[in-house]
């Protein structure tokens, strides 16, 4: 099956695909030049809800890649999109999170509040406290919908793993006895948002990621074509063992693009 015949656009994960531990994976300026030369539209889609979009743009610029803000989506934006569908006019929400989440919600008309909130929205918050846990628990038990940015329980740093958004969601879930609606991968929210931006059908869009349980599972659920790269957390053995197999397994993003 010649993927190159049908693919019109790309949804690219960032961590483990474009960089690892802040170091670029491959010659990024050349890779993105090739993506644009081949005429692919693309969106960078990440579960990271902590950084703001300008911070992502700045980081990519440091690595020699110029990206427009409308070429990036993250799970904070997917959470705001989910809320907007339910509460079109915006309003007060209880937020457990950092600037990336607060800013994404503000764009859609939602602002942080402590009382009479429409929903509880939670993600990674490196200043998480018992008091925040208690407030989130209170609002959810009073009937506020509980939305989580992404389920990643940990994320890698050079010397190991640290707690991610999923660990905070797990604490709130344990206290409130309520599971969150997840906005990020592998739930469809983030891909849905990316497809809206791209304007292409799932079958002609290739999702490229390094994590089977989020990037590949999520992409397959949405009917996207999928490419698993071995430049992040997945080993060749894990890739071979996973079924249903992705459309492509490649060493890195450069190889994916060369095969399209």
Walk through the language-model features, giving the residues of each.
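Asp-based, Mg2+/Mn2+-dependent phosphohydrolase catalytic module
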Residues: 2-14, 19-38, 49-73, 80-260
């Amino acid at each position: 099956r010649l993927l190159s015949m049908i693919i019109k656009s790309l949804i690219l994960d960032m961590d483990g695909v474009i960089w690892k531990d802040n170091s670029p994976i491959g010659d990024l300026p050349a890779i993105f030049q090739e993506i644009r030369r081949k005429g692919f539209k693309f969106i960078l889609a990440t579960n990271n809800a902590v950084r703001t979009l300008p911070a992502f743009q700045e980081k990519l610029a440091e690595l020699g890649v110029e990206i427009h803000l409308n070429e990036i989506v993250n799970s904070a934006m997917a959470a705001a999109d989910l809320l907007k569908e339910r509460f079109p006019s915006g309003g007060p929400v209880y937020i457990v999170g950092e600037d990336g989440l607060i800013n994404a919600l503000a764009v859609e008309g939602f602002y942080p509040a402590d009382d009479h909130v429409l929903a509880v929205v939670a993600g990674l918050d490196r200043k998480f406290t018992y008091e925040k846990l208690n407030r989130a628990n209170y609002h959810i038990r009073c009937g506020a919908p509980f939305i989580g940015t992404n389920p990643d329980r940990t994320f890698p740093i050079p010397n190991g793993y640290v707690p991610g958004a999923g660990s905070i969601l797990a604490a709130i879930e344990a206290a409130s006895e309520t599971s969150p609606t997840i906005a990020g991968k592998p739930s469809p929210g983030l891909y849905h948002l990316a497809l809206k931006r791209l304007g292409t059908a799932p079958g002609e869009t290739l999702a490229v990621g390094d994590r089977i349980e989020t990037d590949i599972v999520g992409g397959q659920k949405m009917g996207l074509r999928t490419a698993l790269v071995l430049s992040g957390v997945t080993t060749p053995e894990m890739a071979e063992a996973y079924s249903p197999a992705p459309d492509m397994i490649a060493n890195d993003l450069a190889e994916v693009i060369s095969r399209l």
